[in-house]
Amino acid sequence: MAKIAVYDINRNQVSERELSDEVFNAEVKEYLIHDMVRYQLAARRQGTSAAKNRSAVAGGGKKPYRQKGTGNARQGTIRAPHFVGGGAAFGPSPRDFSFKLNRKVKKAALRSALSARFKEERVAVLNDFQLEKIGTKAVVEVLNRFELSNVLVVVGEDNRNLELSARNLPHVKVLKAEGVNVYDLMNHRNLVVTEGAVEQLEGALG
């Protein structure tokens, strides 16, 4: 099993722990990560864009003029696409962009993403990340001690002070272990995770 140092928020090493190879040192399968990111982004799409076609536009039920004898080209409705005020030809219609991925694929993709960050040496484990009070400055100071920016922070339990302190920081996001996902792991260069969150991740993915 891989080993990693455990620090407190002052960057003092307090212990060392083993990480599950199955979760943090697995083979990195980039195609799974790619599929999972596509899956997450597709599920976010609204898919509400729409345009009225010739049957949806109001009016146009009556033939504008007789078929022959006027010198004009024959027309059946003034709501055809080539008329001003007519319906759109092949315009967008509401659709659902989401698609399905198997649960095994989702878990394997998350293991690959966690392993990728670990192999890049972009994972820091803290024994805890409790703040005495709400304050953005406190979070900045901790991250500066570790010389980290663009960080995903994963905690094992509700940490309201940390969540409120970090939400005003660009490129810093706080998630509970149960909410960790491939997109956020890939969208942040560094991962800071508490020991409690490590145990939860290993329990869920191991």
UniProtKB/Swiss-Prot annotation:
GO terms classed as biological process: translation
Region (Disordered): 50-78
Keywords, in A-Z order: Ribonucleoprotein, Ribosomal protein, RNA-binding, rRNA-binding
Coiled coil segments of this chain: none
Pfam families, per the entry: Ribosomal_L4
Xref: SUPFAM superfamilies: Ribosomal protein L4
Record Gene3D superfamilies: 3.40.1370.10
UniProt GO cellular component terms: ribonucleoprotein complex; ribosome
UniProt cross-references to InterPro entries, sorted A to Z: Ribosomal_uL4 (IPR002136), Ribosomal_uL4-like (IPR013005), Ribosomal_uL4_dom_sf (IPR023574)
Annotated transmembrane regions: none
Molecular-function GO terms, alphabetical: rRNA binding; structural constituent of ribosome
Function: One of the primary rRNA binding proteins, this protein initially binds near the 5'-end of the 23S rRNA. It is important during the early stages of 50S assembly. It makes multiple contacts with different domains of the 23S rRNA in the assembled 50S subunit and ribosome.
Record text on subunit structure and interactions: Part of the 50S ribosomal subunit.
Family as reported in the entry's similarity comment: Belongs to the universal ribosomal protein uL4 family.
Entry protein name: Large ribosomal subunit protein uL4
Naturally occurring in which organism (per UniProt): Syntrophotalea carbinolica (strain DSM 2380 / NBRC 103641 / GraBd1) (Pelobacter carbinolicus)
